[in-house]
From Swiss-Prot:
Biased composition (Polar residues): 102-114
BP-aspect Gene Ontology terms: cell communication; embryo development ending in seed dormancy; endosperm cellularization; endosperm development; gametophyte development; mitochondrial membrane organization; nucleus localization; pollen development
Protein name: Small ribosomal subunit protein mS75
Keywords for the protein's UniProt record, in alphabetical order: Developmental protein, Mitochondrion, Ribonucleoprotein, Ribosomal protein, Transit peptide
Residues covered by region (Disordered): 99-120, 390-420
Coiled-coil parts of chain: none
Predominant location category: mitochondrion
């Protein structure tokens, strides 16, 4: 409002005719379109030859006669009038004063634009007024931009609060970072991996979509199977359920422990350090993370190995029915392991080969190598989550037995106390 009042004051000071003052003009024309057009124009303080209206431009044609016989030379009809509307020739030639809008490819080799010519003809007061109007336009644009940014910030508060709640949930419960993926996101994941598997690897997709690597393997396999089924049928599959879950994800609230968290026995572990020992110890959270990461890698390798074997069963390469173990007409094929140095087996020395019924031998093929690898025991303790251990049937039975024994001991103690 302060800038607007300054512009009105400058308009009223520029025009010499009271009927053409800017205040009356703005009151009579209150629309925003006229106000904008008025701010893009400059008014001349005089209509004389001050650099705007020259003697040969046709605006200062003298007229004959005298004025009222007063004897004053200034009021003769031959002299130019001092009364002016504040309008110059440029206002009627259609040349805008100030900035050019929709300028079409200005070139530095061409002559200066019409706006530059008009600005060069204006006096210092008019140039200052035009610059002030341009500053006012810039101020309005900045205010509109700030309003748009503020509106976008206010509209995105709900989404940011939901993201913060998810992050707080992750901090409160480590490992619970799984979220429901839409079918469109799974399709996009499969498309990226199919087009460029070297760039969009399993690890990168798991990191981008914030899910487990095992889950990425399963999604890619299912999407590949869907594509194969569509190719066989010649039409797309029914995805009504997937589209329903995509449109209404609140119906399906997923809560998966996407990252393995190791269960540690939090008990003191005192060690006697040598004299003069000046070292540091690791933080408990750091140790917990390292153990969890190591166990997660072990579980991932085991999952991939079992998943590849299950895919072979899916394709029919592994026969597990009751007729697959019958003796063929040629005879049995026997797997023989040759012991190494000092009777060592496995990686320590021995190697396996296949003995055929005719007495010959051959090395193991790929499928037989998979069988041999699956027979190798895992040299590690079983990784079981705390919740599974707590509520497993075996633990429940042991707990009930211990509870019954404690009850029997209490009853025996009470009986012994009464007898004494």
């Amino acid at each position: 409002m302060y800038n607007l009042s300054r512009i009105i004051y400058r308009f009223s000071s520029v025009s010499l005719n009271p009927s053409t003052r800017a205040s009356g003009f703005l009151l009579e024309n209150a629309s925003s379109k006229i106000l904008q057009s008025a701010t893009n124009r400059a008014f001349s303080a005089k209509s004389g030859s001050d650099g705007v209206g020259g003697d040969d431009n046709g605006w200062n044609i003298s007229t004959g006669g005298s004025f009222g016989g007063t004897g004053s030379a200034d009021l003769d009809w031959d002299n130019k009038s001092m009364w002016s509307t504040g309008l110059t020739k440029e206002h009627f030639d259609g040349v805008s004063v100030g900035r050019q809008k929709n300028a079409a490819n200005p070139s530095s080799d061409n002559t200066p634009s019409d706006s530059g010519d008009v600005m060069s003809k204006l006096g210092p007061k008019e140039v200052a007024l035009v610059n002030e109007m341009n500053e006012y336009d810039d101020l309005l644009k900045e205010i509109e931009q700030d309003n748009r940014q503020g509106r976008a910030f206010v509209d995105g508060i709900k989404q940011r609060m939901m993201e913060i709640s998810v992050l707080l949930k992750q901090v409160k419960e480590p490992g619970a970072r799984g979220s429901y993926l839409k079918d469109s996101e799974k399709t996009e994941m499969y498309r990226l991996h199919k087009e460029n598997p070297e760039v969009y690897t399993i690890e990168r997709l798991a990191k981008d979509y914030r899910i487990m690597r095992q889950r990425v393997h399963a999604i890619l396999f299912l999407k590949e199977d869907e594509e194969e089924e569509e190719r066989k049928l010649g039409r797309p599959l029914d995805d009504s359920v997937d589209r329903l879950l995509d449109e209404y994800p609140e119906f399906f609230i997923s809560h998966d422990r996407e990252f393995h968290v190791a269960s540690l026995n939090y008990k003191p572990d005192f060690k006697v350090m040598p004299e003069g020992w000046d070292g540091t110890i690791k933080d408990m959270d750091e140790v917990h993370y390292e153990i969890s990461k190591k166990e997660d890698d072990m579980l991932y390798e085991e999952f991939v190995r079992r998943f590849e074997f299950n895919k072979m069963k899916w394709r029919g390469e592994v026969m597990c029915h009751k007729y697959s173990r019958r003796r063929s007409s040629e005879g049995w094929k026997i797997t023989v392991e040759k012991l190494g140095a000092k009777g060592k087996r496995g990686a320590g020395g021995g190697w396996k080969f296949m003995s055929l019924p005719d007495g010959s031998s051959r090395p193991l093929n790929e499928m037989e190598k998979v069988y041999v690898k699956r027979e190798t025991p895992l040299r590690r303790r079983s990784i079981i989550s705390t919740e599974v251990m707590r509520y497993s049937p075996a633990n429940q039975k042991r707990r009930s037995k211990r509870k019954q024994k404690r009850k029997e001991r209490r009853i025996a103690c009470l009986k012994a106390g009464k007898q004494t």
